[in-house]
């Protein structure tokens, strides 16, 4: 387990900024809590308290499976891909949000896109192709995706047109359990 390089840090924060904007600073500077850090272990970026990172330094690399919250994976090309396990933090700090009606929740949780008929609410001034957090109408985070249309376009579009492209959802915990660890 090692700290992220400058290039890895830049890629991670660029990717996170697409979802949570300037709120990325809140991940490291949490008020009333201890300092948190990002660490790389086996091409996975983990988010944890600094105290936990220091304790993990005593464990050998082969014996350590994971520690903290899995935030992202680094692909073979060096790109960073945000994982659904980071949903709690993305949902908390997200600038743009979409709420899905109960009749479309199941479809989204099985990896489908959301049409206009399933759109409950959308944050004002959401631009087209903006990364968004997806919630149920009861404010339960379901996943994240990309807004297929802006807020104004959503109000004027046909009922069967796509308004949200699926990226990740909490159903992945069950579908891809082996890949998550």
Where are these regions (language model features)?
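Accessory RNA 3′-end/elbow-binding domains used by RNA modification enzymes
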Residues: 1-181
